[in-house]
Amino acid sequence: MKKQQKKTKEITAPVYMMNRELSWLKFNERVLNEAGNPGVPLAERLTFAAIYQSNLDEFYRVRVGTLMDQMEASEVIRENKTNMTSEEQVTAILQATRDLEQKKAAIYEQLMGELEPYGVRLINFNRLSAEEGKLLETYFDQEIAPYLSANIVSKQQPFPFLKNKNIYAVASLMSKGGKTKTAIIPCSNTVFRRLIDIPTRKGTFMLSEELILHFLPKMFKNYEIREKALLRITRNADIDTETIYDEDLDYRDAMEKLIKQRRRMNPVRMELSRDLNKKMISSLCKELHVDKEHVFLTRVPLDMSFVFGLQGYLRNTAQDKLFYQRRTPRMTPELDGKSALIPQIMKKDVLLSYPFENIKSFINLLNEAAKDDSVVSIKMTLYRLADKSQIVDALVDAAENGKEVVVLVELRARFDEESNIEYSRKLEEAGCRVIYGLNGYKVHSKLCLISRKTDKGVSYITQIGTGNYNEKTSALYTDLSLITANREIGKEAAEVFAALLKGEVVEKSNLLLVAPKCLQNRVLDMIQEEIDQVKQGKEGYIGIKINSLTDKVIINKLVEASQAGVKIEMVVRGICCLIPEIKGYTENIKVVSIVGRYLEHSRIYRFGTKEREKIYIASADFMTRNTVRRVEVAAPVLNEKLKERLDWMFETMLNDDEKGKRLTETGNYADRSLNDVKLNSQEIFYAMAYSNAEKTQKKRED
């Protein structure tokens, strides 16, 4: 670990602030806890274990990668809430990770044990019979060995490049002449299966990398294998995507260059399946440019994605009771799918709640707009899209039908860059006007504007969402989508697109809150309004549902509101840098985190008591990157019926004591018991969506 060169005076951090990275690790621990939760169906617990690992991989690539880069700076960089240096944060992260990995190993062993009564086992070679060993050896010789490339490190054959998150077998070899050499064998391969079934034992499997590790002597017959282990590295992914706007190249070509650069960045973590001697670990660290503190030993398979293969086996053997009950998002009862949608939306606002309601209603609207003679243009911001996106298909159809189609495709959506590059080409080829993001600001808003020419002039249908235009994630994440024909909202949405087309951002807005210029300041103003209400002897109320809270300016304003006596209730899924319930600071703030079947992703802002409530749905969390470094849009919900629905949803989430955990004054999360029967907000939302759809269907049939 490179030590920072220059010391700075340590500053005392506010007692109500928590470090962002450590708060995120607490969130990922709650994901891991679901893997160990006996109340979750057994096969689904495997999914949570895999999600925990995937989350941690990305965290190391992005967040630890950023901190490691900061440590290269000559000046000490301190985090602005707890004043921890980059080095202090990395040290704390490494220790917290080791604790979590021990917990993961215990949960993994528990899961494997619980699977055995259902006929599923994952074994090592030493648990095979002699007959089974011969069968597996034949399988190795015929199906795996021909596709392996062994590398013995030497002057003629330098240490090979190791791909991010791929699995390798590493061995210390002793030649007949007594010389020690290192061998590296790639184990990640799409040619052979990773999950190998044992033919004599139904439901019993072995991982291909374990088979490769066992049969290394067959590959190095002239050597004695002194030590061996499986290895996986996680590479830094902290690239500066802003540089694409400085290039003379096409933006897409510049981004493709950066993606290639990212693949070769230094590792930030190395995982080993077995302990090796200090000399060999030192050698590997030197070759891979990994600090020894970043080496982790694990008893758990290095890549947990194999669990999806186990789930497939369980499905095929009719073990449905080990899974969540299958759920199909319902079509919203607010729209009659058998009639044209545009006239219905012109009469009333519609709010879709995913995954309880189906994104198909919005896709149907786009398809209708693509063919409707009154529609002159469709403008849309795209961030993360599904494979084979029906939304892109609708935009292509619209362009081919002669509509003006303007699409901002954010090329810098991390790890979706290549997909977005391909979609931008498809849209351009169809005749759409494509904007590749905005210099200085990522465009993260979920905004769609359909403009129509009518006898009374131009009319608008505007859709504002909290989540991506992605059919896959709309069935997995909780999100909200407002569709409205409100003229003023439409005009302001048009101003957002006009600014984007000029490479600018909106400087002023009235109904919409539009970052980076007019979201944070408007939120602060509304918090101040609640403070003023309390000072006048009235009640003040703030309700916030977001994924993360890191914006120091907003945090300090919320603390000020709490100190003034404003009641503040928040549902914050992930990072929460504000510690609630601290006397004298945050005693009027309550924070709940929900980690359940679906990923909580919707954002709701509520300001004011019932009779004067303002309520918004938004694409923005209260993170500095969202409030001042991105283009984000929050839209007011003006329809009273929809406001009541959002109020009910918010209150239901606050009262969730099955999946909702309370953030305490210690900075830790605690179980709650609020109801005679445990309340699961996601289950209630699905039951309500199902009931409403059934009632409406019956009513229409009558």
Put a short name on every predicted segment:
Residues 1-542, 560, 564, 576-702:
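N-terminal localization/anchoring segments of enzymes in phospholipid and broader phosphate metabolism
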Residues 567-571:
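Hydrophobic alpha/beta core scaffold segments
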Residues 552-559:
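Glycine/threonine-rich ATP-lid/beta-loop region of ATP-binding domains
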